[in-house]
UniProtKB/Swiss-Prot annotation:
Binding-site residues, Zn(2+): C146, C149, C159, C162
Subcellular location field: Cytoplasm
GO terms under cellular component: cytosol
UniProt source species: Enterobacter sp. (strain 638)
Function: Is required not only for elongation of protein synthesis but also for the initiation of all mRNA translation through initiator tRNA(fMet) aminoacylation.
Broad enzyme group: ligase
EC number(s) given by UniProt: 6.1.1.10
The protein's name: Methionine--tRNA ligase
Main location (coarse class): cytoplasm
Ranges annotated as spanning the membrane: none
CDD domains: Anticodon_Ia_Met, MetRS_core, tRNA_bind_EcMetRS_like
Organismal lineage: Bacteria, Pseudomonadati, Pseudomonadota, Gammaproteobacteria, Enterobacterales
The tRNA-binding domain, residue ranges: 575-677
């Protein structure tokens, strides 16, 4: 029977909103989704959420490079990410963004509570500054040699080789990632979270069973080396949330990123009109369960900073962190040059989602081991397991049931003992899914598939079908095979959602965990259609080649507004102050006889009229649409004599030219003549 229903909140680490989802990301999202789908099958109330991590200097700089706003970039990236996850059947209840009202409010709330409770400290620090770019350098924009293990080319916040965390000022021979310049030291006041105050609590939490043994052991090393106060602020320019009452200071991305779990759940509750669940799940004494699926590279933040922040601000801590390893391809780190750095969208252009879901699941355990995607083994395993063992079991029997018995299965089981063997396995398989011992669960299921196919081989329905007077035997044998297929697909339903839907359509029944205790007897199935196709190595070759081509395309010269029209040389504020920009109302707009480029605009500056010629005719072939609209003009530009008359200023527009010219307009409420500052 189904266990007592639990309330569970599950999250995946938030993908960073400056790049595409790749197969490394997909390991975590598939692992979490399989676990979530199993929990739902067992009747538990699961909320499965995620969001884009949308703040930080990398996003700010990439948006500048693309010539768009950070807001536009993260919006477009969020749509891409959500499309990729949907393509892999990741069953999120909500996918949000850390750049949201919910996240801002919660970040400010947690910060304020930490400050009121004495856990925020202020002090002036010496910080690395890029003298060429005129900006303080975030941790990830400084590279150098790790001060702990001496590994070269490591980022300024943590070492990817030994896992150590440190200040960027501790790096040996640091360099700016932005310009390549050697950074200089500059003083700046920063805000620190007093992590050492939570050392005792964190050590107790570590021993509580909330962490895998490997993670707990690693944390013990960090405790022994001593916890340090954590710098949670960054200086402008920065894309993120400004710290309350601290102009020019912003929350470090790693402060508001995990709060994004809360923000996404709050957004989900608001969408549902649910005013109670947020507090119910996040209050300090909550009996709901909270699980974070994360990669081993971000354990430090999730096992130390995050629970301490929650404790210090009066919220509950995670029930458990489920940490996984990295993905390698063909035994090596994913490589763009070898075509093994594969984007999720590229995969879906060549293979279905179920194939990768199955392969990853078959290799996953509860340990923090790396997973190797061996592409040749992938083809062999998918064909051997899904096609030959599982789908073939249905196809070998369905034809006889459909053609000879009009789709109606036998009234009794041909081999009740064998069926009991299959249903008795539900306990062990369920425990394996629950414990994230996915590989073990798959091995158990495939062992049953072997038993089922052995039964069909021994009973040989294709022989029985030719023997007179054995119709009842044929119906019983094939019905038995289909019933065993149903049990196998029920066990595999968390892994193979698309194949499961097709199986349900054929079986004419929903696959539920408890229903397998009752076999399908005298049940009518639908006409069998091919459930799954074999995959070929030529598809792998095409996938790898496509990935190489994408890398070449990405390496092509950057195009876009900034590339076409680079930013001009720096000017002083005094230079800028000489330009008098004013709001102007377009009273009239008309063609200029003798010119195919110009429009004559009559502008009202709040009592003063101006005549301006503007080369925007191609963009506005009907000048009447401009009448009554407000724009911005340079009001103190010296009058220019033209053969059509005198132009008394210049209106502001953006775009490369021709039809792609866009007249600038102020927000509603601006009045003609007001100065633009």
């Amino acid at each position: 029977m189904t266990q007592v229903a639990k309330k569970i909140l599950v999250t995946c680490a938030l993908p960073y909103a400056n790049g595409s989802i790749h197969l490394g990301h997909m390991l975590e999202h598939i692992q979490a989704d399989v676990w979530v789908r199993y929990q739902r099958m067992r009747g538990h109330q699961v909320n499965f959420i995620c969001a884009d991590d949308a703040h930080g200097t990398p996003i700010m700089l990439k948006a500048q490079q693309l010539g768009i706003s950070p807001e536009q970039m993260i919006t477009e990236m969020s749509q891409e990410h959500q499309t990729d996850f949907a393509g892999f059947d990741i069953s999120y209840d909500n996918y949000h963004s850390t750049h949201s009202d919910e996240n801002r409010e919660l970040s400010e709330l947690i910060y304020t509570r930490l400050k009121e409770n004495g856990f925020i400290k202020n002090r002036t620090i010496s910080q690395l500054f890029d003298p060429e770019k005129g900006m303080f350098l975030p941790d990830r924009f400084v590279k150098g040699t790790c001060p702990k293990c001496k590994s070269p080319d490591q980022y300024g916040d943590n070492c990817e080789v030994c896992g150590a965390t440190y200040s960027p000022t501790e790096l040996i021979e640091p360099k700016s990632v932005v310009s390549g310049a050697t950074p200089v030291m500059r003083d700046s006041e920063h805000f620190f979270f007093d992590l050492p105050s939570f050392s005792e609590m964190l050590q107790a939490w570590t021993r509580s069973g909330a962490l895998q043994e490997q993670v707990a052991n690693k944390m013990q090393e960090w405790f022994e080396s001593g916890l340090q106060q954590w710098d949670i602020s960054r200086d402008a320019p920065y894309f993120g949330f400004e710290i309350p009452d601290a102009p020019g200071k912003y929350f470090y991305v790693w402060l508001d990123a995990p709060i994004g779990y809360m923000g996404s759940f709050k957004n989900l509750c608001d969408k549902r009109g649910d005013t109670t669940s947020f507090d119910e799940y996040w209050k300090k004494d909550s009996d709901a369960e909270l699980y974070h699926f994360i990669g081993k590279d971000i354990v430090y933040f999730h096992s130390l900073f995050w629970p301490a922040m929650l404790e210090g601000s009066g919220f509950r801590k995670p029930t458990n962190l489920f940490v996984h390893g990295y993905v390698t391809v063909n035994g090596a780190k994913m490589s763009k040059s070898r075509g093994t750095f594969i984007k999720a969208s590229t995969w879906l252009n060549h293979f279905d989602a179920d194939s990768l879901r199955y392969y990853y699941t078959a290799k996953l355990s509860s340990r923090i081991d790396d997973i190797d995607l061996n592409l040749e083994d992938f083809v062999q395993r998918v064909n051997a397991d899904i096609v030959n063992k599982v789908v073939n079991l249905a196809s070998r029997n369905a034809g006889f049931i459909g053609k000879r018995f009009d789709g109606v299965m036998a009234a009794e089981l041909a081999d009740p003992a064998l069926y009991k063997t299959f249903t008795d396995a539900a306990t062990a398989i369920g425990e394996a899914w629950e414990a994230r011992e996915f590989g073990k669960a798959v091995r158990e299921i495939m062992a049953l598939a072997d038993l089922a196919n052995r039964y069909v081989d021994e009973q040989a329905p294709w022989v029985v079908a030719k023997q007179e007077g054995r119709d009842a035997d044929l119906q019983a044998i094939c019905s038995m095979g289909i019933n065993l297929f149903r049990v196998l697909m029920t066990y595999l339903k968390p892994v193979l959602p698309t194949l499961s839907e097709r199986a349900e359509a054929f079986l004419n029944t929903e696959l539920t965990w408890d229903a397998i205790q009752q076999p399908l007897l005298s049940h009518k199935v639908n006409t069998f259609k091919a459930l799954y196709n074999r995959i070929e190595m030529k598809q792998v070759e095409a996938l790898v080649e496509a990935s190489k081509e994408e890398v070449k395309a990405a390496a092509a010269p950057v195009t876009g507004p900034l590339a076409d029209e680079p930013i001009q040389e720096t000017i002083t504020f005094d230079d800028f102050a000489k330009v008098d920009l004013r709001v102007a109302l377009i009273e009239n707009a008309e063609f200029v006889e003798g010119s195919d480029k110009l429009l004559r605009l009559t502008l009202d500056l709040g009592g003063e009229k101006r005549n301006v010629f503007s080369g925007i005719r191609s963009a506005y072939p009907d000048p009447q649409v401009l009448i009554g609209r407000q724009t911005v003009m340079v009001a103190n530009l010296a009058p220019r004599k033209m053969r059509f008359g005198i132009s008394e200023g210049m209106v502001m527009a953006a775009g490369p030219g021709g039809k792609d010219i866009f007249l600038l307009s102020p927000d509603e409420g601006a009045k003609p003549g007001q100065q633009v500052k």
